[in-house]
A protein has these predicted regions:
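Extended, charge-rich alpha-helical scaffolding segments
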Residues: 2-87, 96-97
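Short terminal interaction segments
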Residues: 86-163
């Protein structure tokens, strides 16, 4: 590939890395909010945060695709090896630092997502246990509730017309 083509693609790749960095920060903020909502038991916030998180993931996906296309444009493979080669060709420590920061943010997001998964599983388990306790209590007392929340007694005893 000609040097001028590589040089022309470099500013776009560098600018893309800066935009990716901002997008990762937004995703990390959304994950922090989601984690805190789970810790605080604020389930009503989760749908909004999930929508925000999904939008950020789509943005990141688009940015990564753009970066891959930029690497292809300069004759490199669209992967980690291609990125490392491009960074080596640039020879600028600030570009390496930006790339390292992006990789660190990705690892941080993965770790946060795993913690969120554990918190969700804990909440679901706690809810299942509470539901089981309520169902067992209702069964043992012979009482159940209808859709309106009114007590419904079972017909296990003698009919009222029996002597």
């Amino acid at each position: 590939m000609a040097q001028n083509e590589t040089s022309a693609a470099s500013p776009a790749l560098i600018a893309g890395l800066a935009v990716e960095s901002t997008a990762w920060q937004f995703l990390l903020n959304a994950l922090k909010q989601e984690e805190q909502a789970l810790v605080d038991g604020e389930a009503d916030l989760l749908p909004k945060l999930n929508a925000l998180k999904m939008a950020q993931l789509q943005t990141l996906n688009n940015l990564v695709r753009t970066r891959y296309n930029g690497l292809l444009a300069v004759g490199l493979t669209p992967d980690l090896a291609g990125m490392e080669t491009w960074l080596a060709q640039q020879g600028k420590p600030e570009h390496h630092a930006l790339w390292d920061a992006l990789q660190a943010m990705e690892q941080q997001a993965q770790a946060m997502n795993q913690r969120i998964g554990v918190l969700i599983e804990l909440r679901l388990s706690s809810t299942r246990q509470a539901l089981n306790v309520l169902v067992q209590a209702a069964k043992s007392q012979g009482g159940m509730y209808d859709q309106a929340g009114c007590a419904v007694t079972s017909n296990r005893g003698k009919p009222l017309t029996a002597a």
